[in-house]
Design a protein with these regions (language model features):
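Transmembrane helix-boundary elements of multi-pass transport/secretion proteins
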Residues: 1-62, 68, 78-79, 167-168, ...
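Membrane-spanning alpha-helical segments of multipass transporters and channels
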Residues: 55, 66-67, 74-197
Length: 197
């Protein structure tokens, strides 16, 4: 249970974040319309819409870690606070990907299909049950695109090895690459807004 559940729950958590982001964006589009919702600044409007959900997703992440390592008293070699900190950029990148999927089409059903295809292999590609070095190049590339793959490396380094905070958080540096999807999301939102005006 400790080996599998500690990876399955974060994989499901990633899916929850991406899908919830899509649903929030779809609800705002439906209830307010693009112009009223995003004008005059799509970036500010998206931050105003999505940032209130970051603490909610973070509390979910905190809850499963506390459940694992305090409630079930699974062995923990490191510090939970390092993992709490590692969850914040993971959440932001999952939300960025959910936003990109939504603004690619403005169609919630199609965006949900993209999100499902993207996140479905999360558990298999994490490198927990199958070594990353033995994965095909395609699987390794897909794994590198999944935010939770980088978080799980941080979790393993802290839980199993008690690594320093800096070493653990260095596993998250690839998440800086998700600034590109965030930028793409803003460009797509602005393009849809300009088309709607």
């Amino acid at each position: 249970a400790q080996f599998l559940v500690s990876a399955i729950i974060p994989a499901l958590w990633q899916i929850v974040i991406v899908v919830s982001t899509l649903l929030v964006l779809a609800a705002n589009q439906r209830d307010h319309g693009l112009v009223r919702w995003l004008a005059p600044s799509p970036g500010v409007a998206l931050c105003r819409t999505l940032l209130p959900y970051v603490p909610l997703f973070w509390l979910q992440g905190v809850a499963f870690l506390v459940w694992f390592y305090s409630g079930l008293q699974w062995p923990m070699q490191g510090n939970l606070w390092v993992l709490f900190a590692a969850q914040v950029p993971t959440i932001l990148e999952c939300m960025a990907m959910g936003s990109v999927f939504f603004f690619l089409t403005l169609d919630p059903a199609r965006a949900m299909s993209f999100a499902g295809a993207f996140t479905a292999p999360s558990f298999a590609f994490m490198g927990i049950t199958f070594p990353v070095s033995d994965m095909s190049p395609l699987a390794q590339a897909w794994r590198s695109l999944l935010p939770i793959s980088h978080y799980i490396e941080a979790q393993v380094s802290q839980v199993s090895y008690g690594a320093s905070a800096l070493t653990t958080l260095m596993h998250l540096t690839p998440l800086l690459g998700y600034l590109l999807p965030a930028l793409l999301c803003l460009l797509l939102a602005r393009r849809h807004l300009n088309s709607a005006i």
